[in-house]
């Protein structure tokens, strides 16, 4: 068949009478050099004031939004009603807590498994349109296997993946996800420091890297921090991706998925 596709038809029956037909197919492989579809899933990180400065993006994008804090329920509801997928940023214990504090409702390593799972489940259920859970800080908590196990058991039960933002060097999240069968991803490209630069040149360079990654691997998850610099730059970035043959798609079409228990 085309590109080496193979189809085998088996006739099953009694004697010379066929009662069933089984068709087994193996899709062909792309020809050498054949272009694969390139996709970018754009995730914007910011609060409601930040997102209000984003205009004229003619493409889907997800929003990494905090799970707690003043007005978070309204913000999550507004995002969902606007058609945006949500990456729920759950505050987790960082190093040097409480001097460094991600905010109210922070999940702590000292909490029992029951409390961690209960609080996390409540946070997820408060928001509609949640397609993944991410860490808000959490450099200390993500190094603790018992803590991460509690989080992963909850996410596996909810059928949600974990999107790990800025992993700490000693974080156990990635290897533990593999052992527990939990869907795990990290942004392929994160435009955070670049979004705080003095000019858009670092943003342009990182976006070029994201486009190249999408072409090479078929897809890229790209996180962009919304700032006064990055917000007005985003529409031109989306147009540049389209001109380069990259389609922006919803995050749910790119991120790995977990199966509910």
Question: Which positions does each model-derived feature cover?
Answer:
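C-terminal domain-boundary segment and adjacent tail
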Residues: 155-169, 174, 226-261
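Active-site beta->alpha N-cap acidic-glycine motif
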Residues: 25-104
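Hydrophobic faces of well-ordered beta-strands that scaffold small-molecule active sites
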Residues: 40-44, 61-65, 84-90, 131-135, ...
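Terminal interaction modules at protein C-ends
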Residues: 1-37
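Solvent-exposed loop/turn segments at secondary-structure junctions
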Residues: 47-49, 69-71, 92-96, 138-142, ...
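Active-site groove signature of glycoside hydrolases
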Residues: 121-140, 216-217, 223
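Alpha-helical scaffold elements lining the catalytic groove of polysaccharide deacetylases
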Residues: 101-125, 142-147, 174-215
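Catalytic beta/alpha-barrel core
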Residues: 43-44, 62-68, 110-116, 131-144, ...
């Amino acid at each position: 068949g085309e590109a080496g596709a193979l189809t085998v038809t088996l006739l099953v029956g009694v004697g010379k009478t066929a009662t069933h037909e089984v068709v087994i197919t193996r899709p062909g492989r792309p020809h050498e050099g054949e272009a694969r579809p390139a996709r970018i899933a754009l995730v914007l990180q910011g609060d409601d004031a930040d997102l209000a400065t984003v205009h004229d993006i003619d493409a889907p994008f997800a929003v990494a939004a905090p799970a707690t804090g003043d007005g978070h329920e309204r913000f999550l509801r507004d995002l969902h009603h606007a058609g945006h997928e949500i990456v729920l940023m759950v505050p987790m214990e960082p190093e040097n807590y409480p001097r460094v504090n991600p905010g109210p409702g922070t999940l702590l390593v000292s909490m029992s498994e029951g409390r961690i799972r209960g609080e996390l489940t409540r946070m997820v259920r408060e928001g509609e349109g949640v397609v993944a859970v991410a860490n808000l800080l959490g450099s200390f908590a993500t190094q603790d296997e018992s803590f991460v196990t509690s989080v992963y058991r909850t996410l596996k039960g909810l059928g949600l993946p974990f999107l790990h933002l800025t992993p700490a060097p000693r974080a156990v999240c990635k290897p533990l996800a593999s052992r527990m069968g939990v869907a795990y991803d990290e942004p392929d490209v994160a435009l955070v420091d670049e979004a705080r630069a003095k000019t858009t040149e670092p943003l342009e360079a990182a976006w070029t890297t994201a486009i190249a990654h999408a072409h090479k691997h078929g897809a890229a998850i790209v996180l962009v921090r919304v700032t006064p610099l990055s917000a007005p730059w985003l529409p031109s970035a989306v147009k540049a991706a389209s001109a380069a043959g990259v389609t922006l798609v919803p995050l749910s079409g790119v991120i790995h998925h977990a199966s509910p228990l």
